[in-house]
Each structure stands twice: as C-alpha cells, then as structure tokens.
C-alpha cells in the first residue's frame, strides 16, 4: 500500500481556482508520475527547508488537508522559502511523482522521484509571503497514530527518548570522515518505536542526541510503507 491515499471530490467548476494539497496529490493516484496540465493552485505553510541542512534541495508545503514535498534545484532554500512563511504553488507544467509510495512535485520525473525546479524558474511556480496573522501549528500525535494522512505534515511527538543513548545524530564514514545520512530510533512510554532520519548534511549531524525523554517536531516521511520522522527547524524539547 502506498503512503498517500488522498481522496477528495473533484471541485465544482464554480468553486475558486485554489485547490487543496490533498486534491493535488490525488491527481497522481495510481500513477508513477503525472503532468499537471491545467492551472491548479495550492497554498500552504513552509514547514521544512535547508536552514539547518535538514532538507536538501526541497521544501515542504502544508495546508489543512496534508503536505507535499516540492523539489527545487537550488541550495539556500531557507533564505528564499523561510520557515513558517506561506507559499503559493502554481502547478501547471509541473509533474507529480510517486516514489516509494509518496507523492511529490517538481519539474520532471527522475529515478528518485520529482526532479528539482530550476532556480531561475522557481518564481514562476512559487510565490512566498509572510504569514501575517496565520501561524502554522504542528499537530501533536503519537507514534502509533502515524498513518498515510500525516505524510509530509509537521507533527509534534511527546514523551519519547532516543534508543541510541550517547550516539551522535549521524554516523561518520571512517574513510572520508564525512557524516552520512543516518536513522536513529525513538521509543515512547508504550514501547512504540519510530525511525528519525537525519541527512549527513545537517548542521548538527556530529552533535550528541538529546538524553532523557522529551518532544520532537518534524515532518513525517514514508518510503515503501515505512514511516520516519525528519526533524525540522531543529525543534527539540528535552530536559
């Protein structure tokens, strides 16, 4: 089963042209990729970028119906797409891609999902504005409550500890000395576990994991039915 099963009725023609992220993702249902051939506009909060190196050449947008990863072929996304700002995505001409069961969007389809929108073209597809009175609030969830509807949304998980006490966020390749993308494991008081995936490019990759029980904020990821959490904006609440 795929990680995304967005089902939403097709909007009537007299409705505004703005659509939901769940509707946009539903257009790819059952297909490896699908070109967006008509003007579909979605609006959502930016919940992930590369401010701490946590997301590479991608941002995550989220509205009240779900979230989606937008592939962009540029670094420094934190400056152009600040965390918590509101972005409007114009979908016409972009391609939805399902990779590992998760639907994302970009300029084309590659071997590992959507290919990044070229830096010189991002202004054509994405516009960004300050949030104003609006504020994104992460949904508080439990590990055993994570399911398809939470993929690419930012959540808060309380009362968890890292299994690998004393380890760093990422392992280091002994040959190159570089940190590598690593999965650690959190466990809650009921014994439920969840992988926490951190990119080797993350600015705190070499720092030790927090000790004790606390809370993590992150975007829910999914690949081939396996869920993980990717910390965003370095939001941690530990003693």
Positions of the model-derived regions?
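OB-fold nucleic-acid-binding modules
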Residues: 3-239
């Amino acid at each position: 089963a795929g990680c995304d099963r967005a089902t939403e009725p097709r909007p009537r023609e007299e409705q505004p042209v703005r659509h939901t992220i769940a509707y946009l993702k539903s257009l790819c249902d059952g297909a490896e990729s699908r070109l967006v051939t008509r003007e579909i506009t979605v609006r959502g909060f930016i919940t992930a970028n590369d401010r701490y190196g946590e997301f590479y050449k991608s941002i995550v947008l989220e509205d009240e119906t779900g979230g989606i990863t937008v592939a962009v072929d540029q670094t420094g996304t934190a400056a152009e797409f600040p965390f918590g700002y509101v972005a409007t995505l114009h979908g016409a001409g972009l391609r939805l891609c399902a990779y590992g069961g998760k639907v994302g969007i970009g300029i084309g389809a590659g071997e590992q999902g959507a290919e990044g929108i070229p830096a010189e073209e991002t202004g054509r597809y994405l516009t960004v504005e300050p949030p104003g009175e609006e504020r994104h609030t992460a949904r508080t969830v439990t590990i055993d409550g994570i399911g398809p509807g939470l993929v690419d949304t930012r959540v808060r998980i309380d009362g968890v500890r890292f299994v690998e006490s004393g380890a760093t966020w990422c392992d280091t390749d002994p040959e190159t000395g570089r940190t590598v993308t690593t999965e650690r494991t959190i466990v809650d008081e009921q014994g439920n576990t969840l992988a926490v995936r951190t990119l080797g490019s993350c600015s705190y990759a070499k720092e030790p994991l927090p000790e004790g029980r606390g809370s993590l904020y992150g975007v829910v990821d999914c690949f081939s039915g396996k869920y993980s959490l990717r910390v965003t904006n370095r939001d941690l609440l530990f003693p």
